[in-house]
């Protein structure tokens, strides 16, 4: 990695993908590879569509069982006055959580809120499900669904085609209004408004423009609703790109499992989403300040008239190979201070630039120490951490590799997340490229 000009600091790198944890919690790691209990390969070869409705029955205070004329069943389960779940498995599977490998969960332990009254009525060819904040109309002849906000009288969701159960995916088709806009889908690099676009709900392990780094099967609409597909499987959301005024949602699953939430505005809809999945991480105070990422335990610096100007008035050129120059280190203890991570902290301070956090190993093969043991390297990292904290800066690491020690790996590239956090005081993780999603 290229390093900054020490005096001007004009080459500070911007951060686009980090995970800040204080303290770090390994229980919040999102599963990157998962599969549902019903394998897609077991899905029917031919496509199936939802048919007309025979009847609907309230089976408990929050749940309605819908029976179609082809004997397929759909469950509508309310998780609050304005949040409901639509589940349909034509192979006969019961309502369940999606399977994840490694094990993970999407919903919080207590995702439900009180539903004061759920009524089911049938009139003029429609079955109507009503709470204080949602009205669902099911067309008995077509099986199509409309969802209304009774507080405004507005139709916020309208199916325009039956749900399609294909051999490899399930597809939902909704109406798009001309003035309707869509936001969400997780980290869609460089994209936040999706009208007229197709977005991928999958980890593409990409951190460049247009890639997907950390997807979420959730979006919200300015029409007054949000949607979360309850799955870990890959998906694709088409917001009028293929067909104008049509939204097509699909996931590589053999069954349908969607949460809909009806509310007005981004804040309310996001709070509904948080009711199901939990509140987002609140960044620590230092996380709102600038961060600095680079490698300070790998490269050599040799005098070169075309190199970078340093404080001693000389110019140096950087090399990852031993070019006979001075090798850098975290703490500048080898007569190499100006090439150290400590020097970076001091430069920010000398230029009156607030620095919140520093990652000293952000480069392939860098590591964070030059001793023969992992414990020795962690002690070296702790020394930097102590110095950084005295100057109001927290330290972190690029994950790069596994989080725990492995036999046969050199001390330079060994990791021990427990000791890094507990002993060295690491408070930041950058998780791109390796480990997460790799």
Predicted regions: what they are:
Residues 69, 211-212, 220, 251, ...:
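Active-site-proximal structural scaffolding
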Residues 16-27:
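Bacterial N-terminal signal peptides
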Residues 276, 347-350, 387, 420:
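A generic secondary-structure signal
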Residues 272-335, 354-355, 362:
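An acidic-aromatic substrate-binding cleft motif
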């Amino acid at each position: 990695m290229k390093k900054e000009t020490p005096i001007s600091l004009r080459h500070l790198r911007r951060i686009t993908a980090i995970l800040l944890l204080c303290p770090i919690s390994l229980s919040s790691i999102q599963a990157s590879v998962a599969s549902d209990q019903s394998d897609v390969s077991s899905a029917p070869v031919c496509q199936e569509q939802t048919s007309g409705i025979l009847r609907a029955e309230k089976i408990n205070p929050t749940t309605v069982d819908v029976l179609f004329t082809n004997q397929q069943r759909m469950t509508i389960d309310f998780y609050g006055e304005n949040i409901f779940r639509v589940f349909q498995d034509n192979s006969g599977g019961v309502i369940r959580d999606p399977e994840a490998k490694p094990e993970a969960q999407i919903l919080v332990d207590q995702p439900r809120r009180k539903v004061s009254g759920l009524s089911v009525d049938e009139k003029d060819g429609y079955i109507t499900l009503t709470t204080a904040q949602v009205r669902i109309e099911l067309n008995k002849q077509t099986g199509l669904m409309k969802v209304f906000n009774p507080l405004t009288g507005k139709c916020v969701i309208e199916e325009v085609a039956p749900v399609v159960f294909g051999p490899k995916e399930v597809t939902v088709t909704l109406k798009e209004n001309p003035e309707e806009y869509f936001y969400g889908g997780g980290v869609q690099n460089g994209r936040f408004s999706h009208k007229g676009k197709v977005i991928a709900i999958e980890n593409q392990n990409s951190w460049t423009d247009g890639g997907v780094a950390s997807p979420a099967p959730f979006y919200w609409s300015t029409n007054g609703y949000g949607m979360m597909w309850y799955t870990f499987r890959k998906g694709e959301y088409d917001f009028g790109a293929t067909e104008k005024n049509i939204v097509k949602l699909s996931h590589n699953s053999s069954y349908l499992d969607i949460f809909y939430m009806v509310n007005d505005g981004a804040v309310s809809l996001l709070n509904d989403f948080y009711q199901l999945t939990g509140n987002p991480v609140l960044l620590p105070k230092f996380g709102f300040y600038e961060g600095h990422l680079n490698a300070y335990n790998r490269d050599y610096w040799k005098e070169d008239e075309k190199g970078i100007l340093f404080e001693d008035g000389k110019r140096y050129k950087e090399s990852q190979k031993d070019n006979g120059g001075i090798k850098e280190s975290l703490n500048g203890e080898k007569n190499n201070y100006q090439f150290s991570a400590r020097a970076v902290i001091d430069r920010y301070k000398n230029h009156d630039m607030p620095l919140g956090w520093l990652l000293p190993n952000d480069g392939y093969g860098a590591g964070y120490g030059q001793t023969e043991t992992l414990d020795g390297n962690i002690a070296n990292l702790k020394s930097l951490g102590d110095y950084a904290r005295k100057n109001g800066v927290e330290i972190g690491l690029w994950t790069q590799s596994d989080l725990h020690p492995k036999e046969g790996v050199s001390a330079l590239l060994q990791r021990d997340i427990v000791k890094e956090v507990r002993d060295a005081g690491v408070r930041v993780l950058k998780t791109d490229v390796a480990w997460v999603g790799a």
